[in-house]
Amino acid sequence: MTMDGDSSTTDASQLGISADYIGGSHYVIQPHDDTEDSMNDHEDTNGSKESFREQDIYLPIANVARIMKNAIPQTGKIAKDAKECVQECVSEFISFITSEASERCHQEKRKTINGEDILFAMSTLGFDSYVEPLKLYLQKFREAMKGEKGIGGAVTATDGLSEELTDEAFTNQLPAGLITADGQQQNVMVYTTSYQQISGVQQIQFS
């Protein structure tokens, strides 16, 4: 990515998000809040759009490196530039999926991007092989959150996610694993930042 002068910031357009998606006519997920003001264009004293700081648009490189190390032998090593490359790719991927999900919300005149929108976007953009395992994880997560609310009645920060994932979104019985073309069952692995263990889904925890 290119830098503007000596600034360490990166413009949102470099993430593959067009100006239309930053404006109020579309809906985007903001890193800090979802108020109406944060969804509009911001102007600084020079009249230019507010830039995102790199630490706001990138996942911690330590987490990225940890995921990468899971895919290589224990004796393998990963160069710094490879980690940074994947770190940027992750942000590009998030922007790519979210923009498609945002378009669906705009067409349906909704302002909240939910789990079903993300799954729809992934399927539309050609990531069909990921949709079924993610449906499984989201249903398990929703059931676990309902169980917690039934026991303690506590309201958590993830309540919005569990409420958005309605029963209509998961009407079909989900498999415990994927069935490959040769009839063999394939285990499902889901990467998550969730602190809790959900039965039936193998998890890799991030710090």
Curated annotation (Swiss-Prot):
Biased composition (Basic and acidic residues): 39-52
Region C domain, residue ranges: 143-207
Region Disordered, residue ranges: 27-52
DNA-binding region: 59-65
SS bonds (residue pairs): none
Positions of crosslink type Glycyl lysine isopeptide (Lys-Gly) (interchain with G-Cter in ubiquitin): 140
Coarse class of the protein's main subcellular location: nucleus
Region called B domain, residue ranges: 53-142
Biological processes annotated in GO: regulation of transcription by RNA polymerase II
One annotated Gene Ontology cellular component of this protein: CCAAT-binding factor complex
InterPro entries, sorted: CBFA_NFYB_domain (IPR003958), Histone-fold (IPR009072), Transc_fact_NFYB/HAP3 (IPR027113), Transcrpt_fac_NFYB/HAP3_CS (IPR003956)
Annotated keywords: Activator, DNA-binding, Isopeptide bond, Nucleus, Transcription, Transcription regulation, Ubl conjugation
Keyword Glycosyltransferase: no
Subcellular location: Nucleus
Region feature Subunit association domain (SAD), mapped onto this chain: 86-97
Family that this chain belongs to: Belongs to the NFYB/HAP3 subunit family.
Domain notes: Can be divided into 3 domains: the weakly conserved A domain, the highly conserved B domain thought to be involved in subunit interaction and DNA binding, and the Glu-rich C domain.
Function summary: Component of the sequence-specific heterotrimeric transcription factor (NF-Y) which specifically recognizes a 5'-CCAAT-3' box motif found in the promoters of its target genes. NF-Y can function as both an activator and a repressor, depending on its interacting cofactors.
The protein's assembly and partners: Heterotrimeric transcription factor composed of three components, NF-YA, NF-YB and NF-YC. NF-YB and NF-YC must interact and dimerize for NF-YA association and DNA binding. Interacts with C1QBP.
Protein name: Nuclear transcription factor Y subunit beta
Organism per entry: Bos taurus
Gene: NFYB
